[in-house]
Swiss-Prot record:
This is Membrane-bound lytic murein transglycosylase A. Gene3D superfamilies: Barwin-like endoglucanases, RlpA-like domain. GO terms for molecular function: hydrolase activity, hydrolyzing O-glycosyl compounds; peptidoglycan lytic transglycosylase activity. Residues 1-20 form the signal peptide. It catalyses: Exolytic cleavage of the (1->4)-beta-glycosidic linkage between N-acetylmuramic acid (MurNAc) and N-acetylglucosamine (GlcNAc) residues in peptidoglycan, from either the reducing or the non-reducing ends of the peptidoglycan chains, with concomitant formation of a 1,6-anhydrobond in the MurNAc residue. Murein-degrading enzyme. May play a role in recycling of muropeptides during cell elongation and/or cell division. Degrades murein glycan strands and insoluble, high-molecular weight murein sacculi. One of its GO terms (cellular component) is outer membrane-bounded periplasmic space. One of its GO terms (biological process) is peptidoglycan catabolic process. Optimum pH is 4.0-4.5.
Amino acid sequence: MKGRWVKYLLMGTVVAMLAACSSKPTDRGQQYKDGKFTQPFSLVNQPDAVGAPINAGDFAEQINHIRNSSPRLYGNQSNVYNAVQEWLRAGGDTRNMRQFGIDAWQMEGADNYGNVQFTGYYTPVIQARHTRQGEFQYPIYRMPPKRGRLPSRAEIYAGALSDKYILAYSNSLMDNFIMDVQGSGYIDFGDGSPLNFFSYAGKNGHAYRSIGKVLIDRGEVKKEDMSMQAIRHWGETHSEAEVRELLEQNPSFVFFKPQSFAPVKGASAVPLVGRASVASDRSIIPPGTTLLAEVPLLDNNGKFNGQYELRLMVALDVGGAIKGQHFDIYQGIGPEAGHRAGWYNHYGRVWVLKTAPGAGNVFSG
């Protein structure tokens, strides 16, 4: 996964800096039917959302992972988990939540009109080889000893680290960078062996700089068009030297630790289920919190199609770019998940689910 603290997520960092809106555009899923909120969380009689959550099975799987991997976290939240699952077994109608002892606290959103930001992240699968050969020329490194300041990305690309720290060679410098930014990935050595999981091992200590912002500042990509796909397309249409120069603008560099097999885990040390878990700002959304989210649906070009789906998700991860009323939805593993993650910089409504009555302080775990 992205490691416990590394989440300088490509999209979280790229899209978090995209322009805040002074008007009320709706092309990214914003809604304004609930009026203005005056506090971060507002207790509502029932979520004003049509339909039932579409991912009851995935939510149940995520709760099982919490129960098995973190008994303490499960114990802190078991009343909510049990109530929500009983509600789901009865059909999951939002009009009936109170009958199951569930309170819904609507989040105010970044604009105070209930529009909560969604971005996405995923776990890539990287093609690689154990030795440098053919197209496989781009090293993936393990953590070197920290003897003073470690080299910058540009210095590492120039050969500043010994070959003894190389774990594998991939066929794409951009793929390496994306795994670096996501904080982990699966490695396919192409020999029929099971995928290896390369987990986050550390970073070089240099400041992170968004290459998406660099492209925008240079006039290479319009702000409104910025996405992971836009960055990939730019890389595919420019020379290797130009791609390297762009990536070197981000001096931060991540190192990895190979594992024969490991499930993707978040900062809460719980395996993550795609689109049933999120990264959150722990200062307002504690680990294990259950969320009912109205997630905007996107077409194949990443455009909001005017519809939403209700999903239940659990806050199990963190991210350096995830602050305030903003969630990063874990999309899963591989290219399809990456495609979904790459488009998300949209808005929807979110309700924090707690056990009634009132649930006391909604900020407490």
